[in-house]
Amino acid sequence: MSVFIDKNTKVMVQGITGSTALFHTKQMLDYGTQIVAGVTPGKGGQVVEGVPVYNTVEEAKNETGANVSVVYVPAPFAADSIIEAADADLDMVICITEHIPVVDMVKVKRYLQGRKTRLVGPNCPGVITADECKIGIMPGYIHKKGHVGVVSRSGTLTYEAVHQLTEEGIGQTTAVGIGGDPVNGTNFIDVLKAFNEDSETKAVVMIGEIGGTAEEEAAQWIKENMNKPVIGFIGGQTAPPGKRMGHAGAIISGGKGTASEKIKTLNDCGVETADTPSEIGTTLIDAAKKAGIYEELLTIKK
């Protein structure tokens, strides 16, 4: 089992003819992802990297059976691309694009209410199910199949955590980057719920950062519902209030959203936290040993 995507997922790339999308389309194909279509208005009929290009999402879906899209469309047009994917009733749309105006995302979020399409992102690295399907911009080679789920607001910290796990012989089920913007689609609790219900996932790494209250809400949900060990890391422990730290959503405002608040809430709810990014792997190992599942997690033969 896996979460959200697997080897049977059929993917379309929105904005496929752009340079960034072309580069990552090749990377995804090399990983083994089934990319069956691309969409760029006005470029229908072209073929790039062996992938047919269509003018609309609807046409691409009808012709190829694609059920998930990944958006590499520039920020001014990305919201419309997400809405187009929702109108075509795709199962999921993963938006990589950064710098989408907050007001655009508020409209998108409202538009998606009551629809079946799940949005992951924006401003995220994507979703990868190890050794099966990679949708996004993450380095594929560090991900190896196993039993640990990863959910994160940060792209590079996801890669750091996954690399540490792999180096320790611990494989992963799925890694989900939910993005660093203040208004996004899928949240921590959505992913934790999916991991909790997934029989292959035995433990979870959750990576948050300053700003907002998503981590505190997730901590409470973990305390009340989670039946698997979860460890956490919060980025931005030295951030001054009022200064945006990289991501649009990573800002301490009105005294809320500090790293220390988040870490305290996680710890109070039974989630062990790593003090530094380099300790994420060892923190997970400690939690796994306490839960008696460490041996089960050693899925990578060295």
From Swiss-Prot:
Residues binding CoA: 17-20, 43, 96-98
Task: Read off the Pfam families from this record.
Answer: CoA_binding, Ligase_CoA
Which sites are catalytic? 247 (tele-phosphohistidine intermediate)
PROSITE patterns for this protein: SUCCINYL_COA_LIG_1, SUCCINYL_COA_LIG_2
Domain of life, per UniProt, equals: Bacteria
Class in the EC hierarchy, top level: ligase
InterPro entries cross-referenced by the UniProt entry? Cit_synth/succinyl-CoA_lig_AS, Citrt_syn/SCS-alpha_CS, CoA-bd, CoA_lig_alpha, NAD(P)-bd_dom_sf, SUCC_ACL_C, Succinyl-CoA_synth-like
Q: Which pathway, metabolic or otherwise, does it act in?
A: Carbohydrate metabolism; tricarboxylic acid cycle; succinate from succinyl-CoA (ligase route): step 1/1
E.C. code: 6.2.1.5
Question: Where substrate is bound, by residue?
Answer: 159
Q: Which reaction does it catalyse?
A: succinate + ATP + CoA = succinyl-CoA + ADP + phosphate; GTP + succinate + CoA = succinyl-CoA + GDP + phosphate
List cellular component terms (GO): cytosol; succinate-CoA ligase complex (ADP-forming)
The GO terms describing molecular function are: nucleotide binding; succinate-CoA ligase (ADP-forming) activity; succinate-CoA ligase (GDP-forming) activity
**Which terms under GO biological process does the entry name?**
tricarboxylic acid cycle
Keyword list, A-Z: Ligase, Nucleotide-binding, Tricarboxylic acid cycle
As for what it does, the entry says: Succinyl-CoA synthetase functions in the citric acid cycle (TCA), coupling the hydrolysis of succinyl-CoA to the synthesis of either ATP or GTP and thus represents the only step of substrate-level phosphorylation in the TCA. The alpha subunit of the enzyme binds the substrates coenzyme A and phosphate, while succinate binding and nucleotide specificity is provided by the beta subunit.
Family of the protein in this entry: Belongs to the succinate/malate CoA ligase alpha subunit family.
Oligomer and partners: Heterotetramer of two alpha and two beta subunits.
Q: Which NCBIfam families match?
A: PRK05678.1, sucCoAalpha
Question: Per its record, how is this protein called by name?
Answer: Succinate--CoA ligase [ADP-forming] subunit alpha
State the species of origin.
Staphylococcus epidermidis (strain ATCC 12228 / FDA PCI 1200)
Gene encoding this chain? Answer: sucD
